[in-house]
Amino acid sequence: MIKKFFLVDKFYLTAFAILIPTSINLSITQFVTPLLNAIMGRTDNPAISISSYSIAISVLFLIALPNLRIQHLTIVYYKNINKLKVHFFVILISTICLFCSVLIIYTPASNIFLEKIFFTEGDLRNNVEKCLKLGFYIPFLLIIKMHLYAVAIVSSKSSLIWAGTIFGFICTFLLAIIFYLIGFEGFRLGISAVAYSLALETLAIFMLVRNDLLDFKLKFTRDIFMVGDLFKFFTPLLFAAFIPSFTMPAINAVLTRLDNPEVSISAVNIGIGIFGAVSFAIYGCQSTILSLMSNGYHYFKIRYFSYFVSFLTLFLCSFIAWINPVNHFIFNTIFNLDEDLYKNTLLVFRLLSFLPPFLVMEQLYVGIIMNSKSTNPIIYINICRFLVLIIFLGASIFLLQNGALVGGLAWSLTLFFEAIFAWLFGKNIKKPD
């Protein structure tokens, strides 16, 4: 049966060939951040440097939020309409984000972000401002890069995804080492390595996919600039990207009101991070599902493949969560968590460990909704998810005192119900043949 699954039906080999590099590409930040932190930790004033870089990059990634969804739009539309129209829309969105970046960083609006939202002052504020000015163009490049990777995904050219991702990672590492040896300040080292490597990676993936970017049989018409249909498709996706970004701040706000908030907040953040690293394959499921649909593969094959990946991930998460020598090695030996933090982090991880099939279920049905090109249900799904989060957090203040339990349940319940709502809204939509 295993032989038949992998060798006879080449669909599964094709699917894995797209999934693995796409998942690594989308989760590469989880590998780059510790690397940069380790190098910045060897510079003068490492705490301020790492904090300055972290705040600055979080602001830039918030401005670049459309990059999380531009890949999905590209995959859905690239083979169905004039490619030039998709390219124009991506350039338009990236230019708008660049304008927002300049407006926020180079005008008095920066004071609102740095002083009122992030409460920075003194050297920390000055360093964050310098970081932002060094990397103001990062949102523009991020959106362009994700669009180019989407072209490689929808063209089923996994080798190009591997090449671009590995090249970008190596560039980041080498540039960070070079800037360290030159004597850059820590925060300048971090933001410069990310910005320059991003520019090089974007150029590299552009060169790799250049033959798939244009179709010379297509005519340059006025319709290329009429992108109202793409905005209509994209707006719900952007809304869906904003809602999850409020989940962690909302949970942290509640945890500060419960017992032992420092340990609880740390446990929830570490638990989520470890779960994300263990379940990294799921990061690429959405793009893989959309690519397979776009290339005409049968829905039932896509569904079987997606759930196969989810149950493999479920097995791995359960193995770590419930086999004591394994979780002790990871949480205590590798992450050096003390007894109290270890127990609370393990509790969070166990509460999340059952989620992989539901995470894939949500991505599958949202993929069906996207493939239909009518994305309004995605707004309703995320509103329902947000209501579940608010209701649970409101009740937990009065009913529960264990912060790790509240944080873990908040994440697991909202993601579980998001999958249920996705199924409810997507089950009656026509599946791709």
What feature does the model see in each segment?
Residues S52-S101, K145-V154, V268-I320, E362-M370, ...:
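Small-residue-rich hydrophobic transmembrane alpha-helices
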Residues A47, I81, V154-S155, G183-F184, ...:
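Helix-loop interface residues and adjacent transmembrane-helix termini in multi-pass membrane transporters
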Residues G122-L148, V278, E339-Y365:
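Alpha-helical transmembrane segments of multi-pass membrane proteins
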Residues F169-T202, F386-I420, L424, N428:
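Membrane-interface helix-loop junctions in multi-pass transport and translocation proteins
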Residues I20-H72, I138, T235-S291, L316-C317, ...:
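Transmembrane helix-bundle signature of multi-pass secondary active exporters and lipid flippases
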Residues C100-E129, L316-L346:
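Short membrane-interface helical motifs at transmembrane helix boundaries
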